[in-house]
């Protein structure tokens, strides 16, 4: 009997992989959403798990970050990641990558997982975060982005991909962090759309906040989280 294909077998077709190019709007968005909130600087070491086509890697490189690695389990991405960054890309699943890391390897300043943690069941996600925690440098952080299951606007992001295993809210993200020996340094929304649309969203959300008995903490469809070792001062 032929092997039944999984959704990951057809992920490249579903996602329509293309090599990213950096436009000024991409750089501004990266600065606003990632670089500034995460307090990144060029001398940091950065690991991106689930780097996809390499857009975040390209932004980091444009900021002068040289000590960076991007991993993804899909080997087809090796021909899609921007050519100057292909030496930074490794086609490997995260568990294998972590198992093969030398204990003597320098600790990592920032570990990025954008649109990744929701692909793991809750227990697997906890185990992954715990394994990453011990790899963090002093003042290191794990930078996440996930669909926002607490908002009606987040459902299209959560359920638009059948490989998603866990739906996160800001509160359940804090719960996951605690279970992993981490704490949430900051949780903040991903702002999408033009300034005009964002203005209208603020008005609508403000009205709903005053109307509903239990409005969500964050209305936007996705949110970021910055996690740090709970033992860190």
Report each predicted region and the residues it spans.
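A C-terminal cap/extension of S-adenosyl-L-methionine-dependent methyltransferases
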Residues: 143, 186-233
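Short, glycine-/aromatic-enriched active-site segment of Class I SAM-dependent methyltransferases
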Residues: 144-164
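Conserved N-terminal segment of class I S-adenosyl-L-methionine
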Residues: 1-106, 110-114, 123-130, 190-192, ...
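A short His-aromatic
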Residues: 119-120
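Short alpha-helix
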Residues: 165-180
């Amino acid at each position: 009997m032929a092997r039944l294909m999984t959704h990951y077998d057809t992920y490249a077709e579903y996602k329509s992989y293309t090599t990213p190019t950096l436009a000024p709007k991409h750089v501004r968005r990266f600065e606003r959403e990632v670089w500034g909130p995460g307090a990144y600087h060029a001398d940091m070491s950065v690991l991106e798990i689930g780097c996809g086509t390499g857009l975040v890697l390209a932004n980091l490189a444009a900021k002068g970050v040289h000590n960076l690695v991007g991993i993804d389990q899909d080997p087809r991405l090796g021909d899609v990641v921007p050519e100057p960054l292909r030496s930074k890309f490794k086609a490997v699943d995260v568990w294998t990558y972590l198992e093969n890391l030398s204990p003597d390897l320098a600790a990592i300043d920032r570990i990025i997982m954008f649109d990744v943690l929701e692909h793991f069941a809750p227990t697997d996600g906890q185990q992954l975060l715990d394994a990453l925690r011990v790899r963090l440098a002093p003042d290191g952080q794990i930078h996440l982005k996930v669909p926002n299951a607490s908002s009606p606007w987040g459902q299209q992001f959560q359920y638009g991909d059948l490989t998603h295993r866990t739906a996160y809210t800001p509160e359940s993200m804090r719960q996951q962090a605690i279970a992993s020996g981490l704490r949430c340094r900051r949780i903040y929304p991903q702002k999408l759309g033009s300034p005009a649309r964002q203005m209208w969203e603020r008005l609508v959300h403000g009205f709903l906040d005053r109307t509903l008995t239990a409005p969500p903490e964050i209305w936007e469809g996705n949110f970021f989280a910055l996690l740090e070792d709970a033992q860190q001062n």
